[in-house]
Design a protein with these regions (language model features):
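Glycine-rich flexible loops
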Residues: 1-444
Length: 444
């Protein structure tokens, strides 16, 4: 085996389905098992991202007759750690009947308000906006994932052609469309027209796959992702996709020293209106990105996948720093002006894109701070959320690097990004979050 092929093999995601363990499981338990396997690997989907579903025949508590019930991951929660109570359950027939009343894309918010009327057995778990995407795909088992390798192809400027090159006719392609009922209708139509397809790539978004059994669905999901991983590894061998390295990384102790000096200073500048906690990441992927000649250009384009920028804001703040010439004091002194500039640009973005009825502008401070030669700092309401934001931006880095290696990376149009960030449904989700704990945002 050549060294390159051996490297490719190490990159692939292992099929961890245990037939013996799965043999005694109910359909619902198999769905949960599949969800845990998929959610355990961040190459498959990020924390809290993606969703899974199964269509299960069950006794109707109202009539005693048998009905088909859509079990689908509900709003919030994480695939890798959720329990059965994390699934929303809906009468499939009622959900499908909503097609007759759908009036077009302007009707999306109203449709979401109708999903609770389809609830089976008084389940309190709120359905997510992806619910109809699962329901209208006429397959028993469906996965929706955000794998870095697949999103790299989805975010490439020639995404449709690359999809054909990677998967042939096994995986289809649909142009960007905001998640909702319109996209669900298009997915359903695609499946009807391509009965032999294993899945479909959604431009600038992610992947849908399906199967006739839970195990087959899991296997198809891994096969589609692994095909992308292997194809990108072959195409990008020896090609970092980020250009030459412009800034060499500092030694690890010095990186930590710089981060330790910056973090309390940044925290003091951004902890109004709410206190925040920071996280530092100097992993290899981050150091390669912040040191590359294309970092400034790519960071300015912004992230593409909605799951990414909802956690990280559309763009990071890249701090100007030349470790060979600049002192730490000089870098620290630049922070107030750099953060003020970012806040002004974010406010201008809000004013350019706001619509009548848009929610009020949110906190304009950066979430992600990139420092050449040093790494990345993220700030959020608590340590866990700051760490997760860093994980999401590493996902975005992986996408940009791989897309640039085979094509050119393309972010979402600014208005599309704004319409998701300030979507009334996202605002409602934020309002459902529990209030901060008394010591949230504080450090000891």
């Amino acid at each position: 085996m050549s060294a390159h092929i051996e490297h490719q093999t190490r990159l692939l995601i292992e099929n961890r389905w245990d037939e013996g363990k799965a043999a005694a499981m109910s359909p619902q338990e198999l769905l949960l098992y599949r969800s845990h396997l998929l959610g355990a690997d961040k190459r498959v989907t990020n924390f809290g991202g993606g969703n899974t579903s199964a269509k299960v025949r069950m006794a109707d508590p109202l009539t005693g007759g048998e009905v088909e019930v859509l079990w689908v991951k509900g709003s919030g929660g994480d695939l890798g750690t959720m329990g059965l109570d994390g699934f929303a359950t809906l009468y499939l027939e009622k959900l499908l009947s909503l097609r007759s009343g759908y009036r077009g894309p302007e009707d999306e918010d109203r449709m979401v308000g109708l999903y609770p009327h389809c609830t089976f057995n008084l389940n309190a778990r709120a359905p997510s906006i992806d619910t109809p995407l699962h329901g209208l795909i006429d397959r028993p088992h469906v996965d929706h994932m955000h794998p870095d390798a697949v999103i790299a192809i989805a975010a490439a400027s020639d995404s449709r052609e690359l999809t054909r090159q990677v998967w042939g006719g096994e995986v289809g392609w649909l142009p960007w469309l905001r998640p909702g009922f319109e996209l669900a209708l298009r997915l359903g139509e695609f499946v009807r027209q391509h009965p032999d397809a294993k899945g479909v790539l959604l431009e600038a978004h992610g992947l849908f796959t399906w199967g006739n059994t839970s195990q087959q669905c899991y296997r198809n999901t891994l096969e589609v992702i692994n095909r992308a991983i292997a194809w990108l590894a072959g195409k990008n061998a020896g090609n970092p996709g980020l250009g030459r390295q412009r800034h060499a990384s500092l030694p690890a102790p010095r990186r930590r020293e710089v981060a330790a000096a910056l973090m309390p200073r940044i925290r003091g500048l951004i902890s109004t209106p709410a206190r925040k906690v920071g996280h530092f990441d100097d992993s290899e992927a981050v150091l390669q990105f912040v040191g590359s000649e294309h970092c400034e250009r790519l960071a300015a384009i912004g992230t593409s996948c909605p799951d990414h920028f909802l956690r990280t804001k559309i763009r990071p703040l890249l701090l100007p720093y030349d470790a060979e010439r600049d002192s730490l004091e000089a870098l620290t002194a630049r922070l107030p002006a750099a953060i003020d500039k970012y806040r002004g640009e974010y406010g201008a973005y809000y004013e350019r894109c706001r619509r009548p009825g848009s929610p009020a502008q949110r906190d304009a401070h950066p979430v992600v701070y990139l420092i050449p030669s040093v790494g990345m700092i993220t700030f959020a309401a608590d340590k866990a959320t700051a760490r997760i934001a860093a994980e999401f931006y590493v996902n975005a880095i992986n996408v940009m690097r791989e897309a640039e290696g085979v094509s050119s990376y393309r972010g979402l149009p600014e208005q599309e990004a704004f319409d998701i960030e300030y979507w009334a449904l996202e605002e409602a989700k934020l309002r459902r979050l529990p209030p901060p704990r008394p010591l949230a945002g504080r450090v000891a």
